[in-house]
Regions:
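Elongated, amphipathic alpha-helical interaction scaffolds
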Residues: 1-310
């Protein structure tokens, strides 16, 4: 029997009616051409996901069945699935993993949440006079890349508008949490799976500096299993985890190289643009913005900001 998600509707008399709409997870087709990142492989398990939600929210839930995972298939990613969405506490949570900084995530989240709400209300009367109740969303990004970013940053949709408008009718804010290295230790201590994941990915990245990538991943897996890090998961999914880790690292390296090449091309082709960018960075610095915030707003790395400010 198909599960149903409940949408409450209130009429003008105050009486509530409940309309059933199909849960997203029941109606979305599965497309196996997309690979899940290691992060998603871990946290699509309800026990791990509940552990992460408790760590983020400060809650202490113990029953993973209160989670309703409703991740969209074939949403807006190209070849790698790095997001998960779920309902709990009357809220709609969207978690995404990133190994490279992406300033366009607020817009991507907007597109994603619109598709989710569309699915959730597919049988509701959007043209009626009764209010259709929808769960409020929250957007979290778990970042574990090489770029030096703050432990916590807020990415706003309004920062993407061509024209600054304090009265813009649409806003969306996403919180980015840096889980690389020593960042957000308290959060990682509260979620063992997240801590182990961060340890594993840090090992892969470190060993890849001196070994062939496949050898670096194999060494990281072997050490983690010996140290009890993701041991059960790696015992069950060793081959798949190795394949995904190699693919992810190659993707991360490729994207980083593309950004570096674009930066160099821009410098060679547009000296004037570089001057204007430097002026913008200096102006933001004089206004009290931190180097990390300047990097985010200008869509460049923290190292590039620091070089200009020196």
């Amino acid at each position: 029997m198909t599960k149903k998600a409940k949408t409450a509707m209130t009429d003008t008399s105050g009486a509530k009616q409940v309309q059933s709409v199909p849960a997203v997870s029941d109606v979305a087709p599965v497309n196996r051409t997309y690979k899940s990142t290691l992060f998603i492989m871990l946290f699509q398990d309800k026990n791990n996901l509940l552990e992460l939600y408790n760590a983020v929210s400060g809650k202490h839930y113990t029953d993973p069945e209160i989670l309703e995972i409703n991740t969209l298939e074939n949403a807006i990613y190209m070849t790698v699935k790095n997001d998960i969405s779920f309902l709990i506490d009357g809220r709609l949570s969207l978690y995404e993993h990133q190994s490279t900084y992406n300033p366009n995530l607020p817009l991507r989240f907007l597109i994603y949440i619109a598709k989710l709400y569309s699915r959730m209300t597919r049988n509701a009367n959007l043209y009626g006079t009764k209010v259709i109740r929808i769960p409020p969303p929250e957007f979290l990004i778990f970042y574990n890349g090489k770029e030096e970013l703050p432990e916590r940053a807020v990415l706003n949709l309004s920062d993407m508008y061509e024209k600054e408008d304090p009265h813009a009718g649409l806003q969306l804010s996403a919180v980015m949490l840096n889980i690389s290295g020593e960042n957000n230790q308290k959060l990682k201590e509260a979620c063992r799976t997240l801590k182990d994941y961060a340890i594993y990915t840090d090992k892969v990245r470190r060993y890849a500096e001196e070994l062939e990538l496949a050898d670096a991943v194999e060494r990281a897996i072997r050490e983690c299993m010996e140290e009890g890090v993701l041991k059960d998961f790696l015992e069950k999914h060793r081959a798949e985890a190795k394949e995904m880790s190699i693919f992810e690292y190659d993707q991360e390296k490729h994207m980083r190289q593309e950004r570096e090449e674009a930066w160099e091309d821009g410098r060679a082709a547009g000296v004037n643009e570089g001057i204007q960018l430097a002026k913008q960075i200096l102006q933001l610095s004089h206004q009290g913005e931190s180097p990390a915030e300047i990097a985010r707003k200008c869509n460049i790395t923290l190292e590039q900001v620091k070089k200009i400010l020196e």
